[in-house]
């Protein structure tokens, strides 16, 4: 039998692909807000995924964000119905897969697969430099972005730049060069084949 980490990563990939498909299909069907709930079991780790999909004119095309703790993942999706179309589907699916992989990394951390996660207590909107340089966040971001870059067939440095530039456009105080430098050093250890 394989190591717990390898089993977790293999099942995580299946989970992400299946859930992204289910969530995507639910997102393009209908106009009413909906809630989806799924349960998934990784050996000894039970994962509960709760998804809230809403439709709003107050977002550009779509907005996806999530959180996790212990064995729960929460995903929030807001869609601008008129602008959400076939041209945006590919990016939507890539962002969704990135988010699911990011949050699954945290589930693995919470449950001791990668060592025990720390409780951060940081609101990312208040201290982005600290948030982006926490070891557990670095790994979660890099694994999520790696999943996204594979889906979009881009390179990881492009995805890092895109993510950090998006945050920098909202908060000019973020030290994107410093964060990117730290992330690249970590990439050399956990995902060296991506560089």
Model-predicted segments: where are they?
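Glycine-rich, acidic and aromatic/proline-enriched surface loops and short helix-turn segments
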Residues: 106, 110-114, 146-147
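Active-site scaffold of zinc-dependent metalloenzymes
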Residues: 56-94, 110
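Amphipathic, interaction-prone secondary-structure segments
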Residues: 37-68
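Hydrophobic or amphipathic, alpha-helical segments that drive membrane association/targeting
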Residues: 2-14, 43, 54-58
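Zn2+-dependent metallopeptidase catalytic core
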Residues: 16-46
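Short alpha-helix carrying the canonical HExxH Zn2+-binding catalytic motif
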Residues: 92-108
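Long, well-structured alpha-helical subdomains associated
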Residues: 128-133, 142-195
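Post-HEXXH active-site segment of zinc metalloproteases
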Residues: 94, 110-138
């Amino acid at each position: 039998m394989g190591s717990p980490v390898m089993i977790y990563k293999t099942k995580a990939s299946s989970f992400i692909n299946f859930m992204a498909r289910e969530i995507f299909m639910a997102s393009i069907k209908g106009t009413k807000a909906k809630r989806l709930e799924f349960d998934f079991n990784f050996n000894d780790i039970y994962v509960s995924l709760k998804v809230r999909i809403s439709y709003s004119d107050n977002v550009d095309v779509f907005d996806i964000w999530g959180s996790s703790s212990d064995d729960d993942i929460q995903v929030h999706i807001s869609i601008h119905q008129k602008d959400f179309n076939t041209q945006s589907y590919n990016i939507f699916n890539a962002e969704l897969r990135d988010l699911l992989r990011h949050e699954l990394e945290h589930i693995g951390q919470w449950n001791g697969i990668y060592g025990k996660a720390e409780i951060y207590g940081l609101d990312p909107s208040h201290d982005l430099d600290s948030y982006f340089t926490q070891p557990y966040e670095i790994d979660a971001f890099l694994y999520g972005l790696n999943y996204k870059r594979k889906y979009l067939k881009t390179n990881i440095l492009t995805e890092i730049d895109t993510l950090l530039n998006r945050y920098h456009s909202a908060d000019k105080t973020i030290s994107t060069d410093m964060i990117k430098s730290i992330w690249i050093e970590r990439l050399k250890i956990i995902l060296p084949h991506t560089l």
